[in-house]
Amino acid sequence: MSESQSEIEHNNNNSKLTKISQPPTVRIIPPLNFCPVEKQLYRSGQPSIINQSFLQDLNLKTILWLASEEPQEDFLDYCSMNNIAVEFVGLMNEYSYQNVNPWDALSEDTIKKALELICNKENYPLLVCCGMGRHRTGTVIGCLRRLQGWNLASVSEEYRRFTGSRGGRIMVELLIESFDINSVQIDPTKMPGWLT
């Protein structure tokens, strides 16, 4: 903040107070449903142009795209200009990279692939996202929490926190509960410190 944007005043206790006379020139706006998950691991809905200043400070190396549709072109351009690798995990299903419906749950193979990318510290800092940052992102983060040893009540509470007033999807919660965490192959030499 420049001196023209703020003035320093002294109060009765001789401590300094900063009075802001005009707003900052750069707006820092996080993506929809943004939240840190673990150190250098974040979740959100699809970032847009107004979120680029915020994302810049995260120094992202990888974005894990879980939506069943292609991301917006400006999002892909931003990733390309900033050397951010985008992993299109949500566009695949058991059959092919086509015919994936937005309302379909993620397959176990898709969740497994997403978790293996998350459990590799070489991909960090990493953002996990889908269109709104709710159900698909919530599924993967819920399965990650199970991998971390969280109890199901805590996993469900975190999932529901991001689904809003419409609530969660019971089928998603059942998928998180039944997911075979032992199917995830993790290289112990590449695990993030918070997973050990």
Curated annotation (Swiss-Prot):
It holds the Pfam family Y_phosphatase2. SUPFAM superfamilies: (Phosphotyrosine protein) phosphatases II (SSF52799). It is found in: Cytoplasm. This is Putative tyrosine-protein phosphatase OCA1. PANTHER family: TYROSINE-PROTEIN PHOSPHATASE (PTHR31126), TYROSINE-PROTEIN PHOSPHATASE OCA1-RELATED (PTHR31126:SF8). GO terms for cellular component: cytoplasm. InterPro entries: PFA-DSPs, Prot-tyrosine_phosphatase-like, Siw14-like, TYR_PHOSPHATASE_DUAL_dom. GO terms for biological process: cellular response to oxidative stress. Residues 33-192 form the Tyrosine-protein phosphatase domain. The active site is at 130 (phosphocysteine intermediate). It catalyses: O-phospho-L-tyrosyl-[protein] + H2O = L-tyrosyl-[protein] + phosphate. Belongs to the protein-tyrosine phosphatase family. GO terms for molecular function: protein tyrosine phosphatase activity. Its EC number is 3.1.3.48. It comes from the Eukaryota. Putative tyrosine-protein phosphatase required for protection against superoxide stress. Keywords: Cytoplasm, Hydrolase, Protein phosphatase, Stress response.
